[in-house]
Amino acid sequence: MFWHLLCVPNDENASAPDDGNQSCQPSSKQDQYLSPNRNCQKNLLRLYPPPPSKPPPLVGAILQTRLLHQISPSAIADADADLNAVGELLYPNVLQRSATLPAKHNRLGVRSRVTFKVPSSNLPAQDSYSHQPRNQVAVAAKDGILVDVKAKESVKMTSEDLLQPGHVVKERWKVVRKIGGGGFGEIYEGQDLITREQVALKVESARQPKQVLKMEVAVLKKLQGKEHVCRFIGCGRNDRFNYVVMQLQGKNLAELRRAQPRGAFSLSTTLRLGLQILKAIESIHSVGFLHRDIKPSNFSVGRLPYNCRRVYMLDFGLARQYTTGTGEVRCPRAAAGFRGTVRYASINAHRNREMGRHDDLWSLFYMLVEFVNGQLPWRKIKDKEQVGLTKEKYDHRILLKHLPSDLKQFLEHIQSLTYGDRPDYAMLIGLFERCMKRRGVKESDPYDWEKVDSTAIGNISATGNPSIPIKSDYMHGNITQMTVAASNASGTEYIRKRAEIETAHITATDPLNIKEKVDKNCNATSLAQPAKGSGEPMVQHGNAANNQNITSKGLQQQSTLTNSQVAIANIQSAPSMIEREDVQYTKLEEGAPTKFITMKPNGECDNVDIAAKCIFEQKHVEANDDIVGRASLSGVEQHYKSQIKKHNSPEIANKQIQRTGTVTNDKTSEVNRSTEEQKSTFGRLRVLTAPPMSVHDLPSGGGHSHQVSDLSGKQDPYAATSNAAPIGINSSSTKFGSQHGQIFGLAAMPPINRRSATSTNLRPSSSASQRINSGSTIGGAVGNGSNTARSSVAGDHSVTQFALIDDENVSALQQVTKGGALTLASQWKSQFDDSEDTTDNEWNREHQLQPNLEQLIKLDISLPLNEAKPFPQHGVAGTGKLINPPGEAKGRPKRYTLNITGIENYEALRISIPNCWSEPAMGNVLRKGLEPPAVQQAAFDDTVYRMDIARNVCVRETYSEITHLARPSTSSVLRNRLPSPFKKDSALQLNSTNDSLDKSRHRNSLPNVSVNDIFDDLQMKLNLDLGSAIQENNCCISGRLEIRVIPKDTSHPDDSVYYDAMGAVKNTPTANEGHDHSDQAVNNCDEMEATSAVIAFPNKSISKIMSPPGRDATEERTGASLCSLYSAGVNKLKLNGNTAPRTQFKKGSTDGFGENESEFDFPLLNPSKIPVRQSKCASWAGADFISASKPLESAEVPQEIPYHPQSDTTYSVIDSIPVRKTTYSIALECPPNISDLTPGLSYFYCNIVVPLRLFSILLTES
């Protein structure tokens, strides 16, 4: 795989002439040995590490050469020739460059350099290759083979990770970086794409024999709601791995202890920690589980302001349930095996006995001793059995020497317990509280890691020496530090060597009047004195935004970039290569006067903030003004404001641009530093607790007040363009002056991956403080200069940052657990206990590539504020989208709760309406004064349900109660109900105006809903005589429709379960009169379905229609079909709420059901057998039912046609519809109970059968 290259001028050759004849000064001894006569080219290609996938192409050839060396010395010449041939084949134009490769698993951390041939596109092949000595390839092959093997192993480790940065688990959790790994799985920091909070993903391979996440999930779920247990978010599994997602925590107690000056906690901190751990142990015991791996690294503090003083229990992989299903203690096993960590394990665990509740308390006791004393007597012992013997023989009362005497009672209590005994938690908790009360310890007192060691700061200020030998390694003067905002980008840990273990590198507070150098990119950097000695870190003051190669022995170069775009490309491409012996700090002028960036071997920067939790002021700064990210500290702010203005002036910037390079040796740098110190006054920082600040308090601009209209043609020389400027600013300091995203026209560029100098992987602070790039715009679009404030849900506040601490003890059965805890910034060790020659050996993490910059953009997309308005009119920042200006927000589709036309005009109503209509409550009356859209209606045929959408209550009404109905023409009513033979009669051909025809066509085209006031018709008067009957008998019947498949041969009339819906009706007058041809007619009426008349005809009206006595079967069919047509016509009139259609029925036209033609020459329907449920049935079809016990006189009749005697004609069928007084059918006299019918039968019966039967009666009597 080709190695990634970046075309930038070489820093080492910045001042060299263009002819390339002068030789470059080597950056290290190894480099000088490898290429003593290396010529300088005008444009050298900087080599960076590749993505962790495959070794470089030439490594294979180098390995082949090495093998040939071992096989035959005579093959060396041929191997060199083959190697050159391979190089020429792969790279037509090559340059030879040496690069530093990480030495994986090298305990001393030595980093070697190896020479590779890399392509060059701007130089001829013969020129570039002719400058290189031929024998250097063999030198590279000899010296680089061992390094490449280790690089290969590093690549292998990374490629075998279960997850990679950028992966999304379950379409919800995006992997940010790996923060731990071991024999039981891997731990990643991730981001919840829904809530935007940082989470921890614990992953184990599905193929490993020992599955522990199942127990982890079980215990974690049981413990939810407990005070000292982190929140469980989710879990799952696939064919590759199992995973559990939980709340991300901060530093563990092992790291916090080692960060202290003497490696121990004060008694005040120890007592309060012991009390919290005791309560956590009691909580897990209360749910029936033992932890069995109590140790400092399995307890961490929270990382948010509200929980940063709370201790959380982690890692339940070794937990065991000690109770049975009934709550009794399980019987102990004879040989249970060792579980836990050797240093903190109880004597029972060393004896392989079954562990009980008291064994967790033994581990707590050992933790308390280590907290106060700094170590345990058996710390140096490596053998587990030897540690167990030591614990048995050791007088534990000696361990209480520096502990309160009251804790002797704690020791005596746990010594008296056995496996099945329950500890007296209340007594032990009271013991700790009594000790705290006697010593005046308050819960609000600051913990040791929250304090500032003023003595250490004074020593730093007095000496100005960046390295002071102190016991703990990589601590910073016992100073609480602010978390780096952008330090979560990559996962490579800093590798310490043995020479650094006993030396603490404490960064000094710079003199206030040190003059910064301003390079051509307007990045102010200050000079400092480099450290002496090969093993000590050297403070380099280069350009923080340029990730340059810096030589190891005192050479300090300023990067000379031709334009700003090259600088940005340099940042984005790859990390720089640095010597292993160097720890390079770059002064951060913009953030605070005590902030340094550590340039790590992979080019990442560590923010070392001396004054932790400093409150940064927010100041609005106009464009072309000075930087705004300043510490609000007395004496510092005014000085730096003037300094920044001075050094960011165009004159100085132009001078810097004219320079081709700056080379400073040790002596010059030291003299300059001493000169500045004579004139300097040292500022001491006051550490304050960072207030939990809400993003709602921030200005809408989010600190980015620069309005950039032309990105490409205008560059602001006054704005701070350093990427390193805001990385240490917490949520309390969200004002940045860094506008590089807009100034350089690369709005989508994320910040540089940064890490603390303690080599800890710290997650970003919640606001990422509006992120470095202004607006987080995507695609290079011009933002409006303001960043959407992050919601409080996504506000992650990281308050503390501490020195690098390793968990030197590995739990049993956990080969490499790295502490096994979901600690955010922890490193986990791989050795069993302490190493042979040092007590602080560490686990070397695999080299991980910096994640893609495009993926980083999506990490910290700001969420919109949770405004009170549910539908803001302005644009809402979506994931990866630019905030739309108000003009563009109008084109965005609006969000509706319910699809109601015009609801957007009712702001208050829109908030209260539900998301959907689901099972509304049926009532009798609605609130008065409701108007649309507060009231909606759903129409089902002639029944309308009016609904109060705010309260989800509806009432059932008929069409006539809510609509304005016109007086129907008698001719239209008649024509809609007469068969076609009658329509042809000239006496029935009444005049029908074109207006009525147009209205009828319009009505037929309307949907099946009730519409108000479509025509300007007069409201019909309701029949007051029938109103009482309607109100008395109109009721809602609930039920359900059941459809069953039944065999065809079960149509026996005596069947008690199934009834023939079209069965014969006996004893009716029609059947008695015409037995020869009445079957076809009466088949349309079933006596089972007869009901009290819904529509009853009076005697005088029925007698007005004369029918020939000698009618045939066809006429009987016609009469039966006429009933169906009549029902259809009535249905039309009801469902639309106006007059019935007045159109003449033509051939081929359909009625309201779309089935029956008006020319009634069609066969009768086949009988359908539908089961009848002896229960209530629904009236969804819209028919109005009454009980069978009611008299026929109280039957409900239609109200739309009032009685007008003066308009009666000879051919008027439906002139008046009074209450029916007499019956003409035996079936109608004894109707069945409507409640016995299914909804389908109810609909068929009420709308078809009854009108059909009535009309047949009409024909019979006539």
UniProtKB/Swiss-Prot annotation:
Source superkingdom: Eukaryota
GO CC entries: cytoplasm; nucleus; spindle
Start-end of Basic and acidic residues biased regions: 667-679
Binding-site residues for ATP, renumbered to this chain: I179, G180, G181, G182, G183, F184, G185, E186, I187, K202
Cited SUPFAM superfamilies: Protein kinase-like (PK-like)
Name of the top EC class for this enzyme: transferase
Ranges of Polar residues composition bias in the record: 20-35, 755-776
Ranges where the Protein kinase domain occurs: 173-436
Protein name as it appears in the record: Tau-tubulin kinase homolog Asator
Lineage start: Eukaryota, Metazoa, Ecdysozoa, Arthropoda, Hexapoda
